[in-house]
Amino acid sequence: MSLSVEAKAKIVADFGRGTNDSGSTEVQVALLTAQINHLQGHFSEHKKDHHSRRGLLRMVSQRRKLLDYLKRKDVARYTSLIERLGLRR
């Protein structure tokens, strides 16, 4: 199941640069992180759902690519985003 419209709007408001900024790298990474976290809960109940697991791996790969891009372009925004999302230890 995907995120609700309200959850997406809240993420866009929290991480976006403007009110309708849904395309910035930070927003895309935050949305992917929310979907990944949701799917991790799904897999605790449905261990053999390999079809969804493939989608999860695709999302993780896409998030990694976006984070690599952001790290290349603006390290300060990258570190800020990592801290806000709690992705690195």
From Swiss-Prot:
What's an example of a GO molecular-function annotation for this chain? Answer: structural constituent of ribosome
Q: Known Gene3D superfamilies for this protein?
A: 6.10.250.3130, S15/NS1, RNA-binding
Question: What is the stated purpose of this protein?
Answer: One of the primary rRNA binding proteins, it binds directly to 16S rRNA where it helps nucleate assembly of the platform of the 30S subunit by binding and bridging several RNA helices of the 16S rRNA.
Q: Which residues form the signal peptide?
A: none
Please give the coiled-coil regions recorded for this protein.
none
Q: What is the lineage of its organism?
A: Bacteria, Pseudomonadati, Pseudomonadota, Gammaproteobacteria, Enterobacterales
**Which Pfam families does this UniProt record tie to the protein?**
Ribosomal_S15 (PF00312)
Question: What PROSITE patterns does the annotation carry?
Answer: RIBOSOMAL_S15
The name of this protein is: Small ribosomal subunit protein uS15
Biological processes annotated in GO: translation
